[in-house]
Amino acid sequence: MVMPKLVTWMNNQRVGELTKLANGAHTFKYAPEWLASRYARPLSLSLPLQRGNITSDAVFNFFDNLLPDSPIVRDRIVKRYHAKSRQPFDLLSEIGRDSVGAVTLIPEDETVTCPIMAWEKLTEARLEEVLTAYKADIPLGMIREENDFRISVAGAQEKTALLRIGNDWCIPKGITPTTHIIKLPIGEIRQPNATLDLSQSVDNEYYCLLLAKELGLNVPDAEIIKAGRVRALAVERFDRRWNTERTVLLRLPQEDMCQTFGLPSSVKYESDGGPGIAQIMAFLMGSSEALKDRYDFMKFQVFQWLIGATDGHAKNFSVFIQAGGSYRLTPFYDIISAFPVLGGTGIHISDLKLAMGLNASKGKKTAIDKIYPRHFLATAKVLKFPEVQMHEILSDFARMIPAALDNVKTSLPTDFPENVVTAVETNVLRLHGRLSREYGIK
């Protein structure tokens, strides 16, 4: 019996084949020409370069992590393209042409040559149609009139991806890559004891990215875009890069920490068995920029605490995979503050918890309102991260936060919602007080 295969490419290089067995299992095999190539690198650090079939769970988990987390979105993909199932192979058969990182998946009978960029420019009305497609049960902005527009964007939020050419937003054709992730408002999330109003998530994330950049963290550029009544966040993809002549858009290999550790997305949170700070810091010891990456990762943990970012799980940290299998940390992404949803029918500040715990005198500390500088210092000590560097990170935040908040506020567009600014700023300054008292900074 002939088993169905998907050929995996990185840019115009054939990497290997993904096979779905009769029992539904997924196997992967690197192509001999890829193993011999000077560009060779593992598809994932959980799938080392080797000859023969790889049959470990890491194969299924790697490809599954390329897909949206939401079962609802996956069902929409099945419905839109008549996919055979919600299994990674069957979904990626339909939407694997432009995935996260450098992965392109196409059927055996298709070939990839040196890519010729092709796209369709969107009018404002057409852009609005793409951005509101999810309301009509259409996944990832893949509207019915565009059968050639097939992308896969991981994550839990409603989003799509588009190509930016000059000032125009475009739908890519064929295997032309996208340049931006377009994120839609999350809306309301109903929980047993609260309703979380994230209808302003676009503004929230934009604000957090600006503040992160102002404080020296490596984050992607982003802008708020509008089409008709739609307000969305366009985030520049750091897994894409134009060639020198700006004629070809290259895909850059990367993977998230669930893929790195060979884990399913269902355990992306430390509380569910996923990696925490200690595991990721140990992994970053092997980075090609280990000292910088470990410093930046610890700095980002403090930033998440200050802004009340509760979603810093394993899928929200990634590494670039370089030739030969070396790796380094990517920019930080998917940053949103929980402070604007406090109060009313929302949640109490005592309910806010970091996704990855800090070391305390007894066990782990995750409750944001119970965390103090000493918990970061205790964590650094356990990790053998230099105490002087941890003090430097904390004291720098103590010194920089007030001016950074002012600078971000003055740079915001005039129609930016004041309640988002007030909620984040008030709580950041309250937690900042713990730093300023510790380091004697007024």
Regions found by a protein language model. Give the residues of each.
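Phosphate/dinucleotide-binding and metal-coordinating scaffold of catalytic cores
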Residues: 1-314, 318-442
